[in-house]
Amino acid sequence: MKYEEINFKVPVESPYYPNYSQCVIERIYSILRNQKDMGDDRIIINTNLKKGLPLENINKIAGPMIEAWAEEVFSGIRDNRDNQYNLINVEAQERLGISDIILQFQVNNNVITGNVDVKATSNDIPDSGKSPNITSFSRIRTAYVKDPNFIFIILSIKHSVYVKRNEYTNLMDGIMQIIDFNVYDLKYISDSDISYNPALGTGQIQIKDIHYVSSQKRTTWQMCQLLDLKYLRSKKRTIEQFYNEAKRNKWIKD
């Protein structure tokens, strides 16, 4: 069996997809930039530890904390019905969902949905942000087939952690401060920046270095083909495994 012989369903996105993607990216970036400019860029962790937080292990809780901060920021904007970003809906997703947060923006007469995956990286750890797992190969491949206009956003948030004595309790508070952030549409990340790790189920799509990403315009079908190529180039995968996965997830025409 050859890849070229498989009768795939070919997803075709709207011609307006690039504009909608750019709109979602710009609004997310603008919201977070404004939040940081206002000084609301810190998570304060109160503890009863006299020496403060164990900074060498703080990255273990950073992900959920940063994700909760981002969801709270977006929800605060949504609660203002006249917000300048036309953000009309925010939904935090379950732990095993394809994304962490769903954002919906009103754009003219359309509602545009961004599926946001929040990735926390540490400014204090040299290799933080290198090859993070983004999503399951089969899950994202299926999402693009089911909805050719599926917008999967990677929100990379870099933080730094330090301790500061609380003048009221005289104990040490942990301060998790947002240092920088970037917003990407997975579909437009360059071929050279995307990698595939066969570990965990059908494998994980990874970004080689989430802090340094270049862009490359492509269609939804081209993205599906790129994902397939990454999968099939793995020495631990075969065309037979791929075909079975394609049948199971209905990527092939009946």
Curated annotation (Swiss-Prot):
Its EC number is 3.1.21.4. Keywords: Endonuclease, Hydrolase, Nuclease, Restriction system. It catalyses: Endonucleolytic cleavage of DNA to give specific double-stranded fragments with terminal 5'-phosphates. Transmembrane segments: none annotated. One of its GO terms (molecular function) is type II site-specific deoxyribonuclease activity. It is an enzyme of class 3 (hydrolase). GO terms for biological process: DNA restriction-modification system. This is Type II restriction enzyme HpaI. The gene is hpaIR.
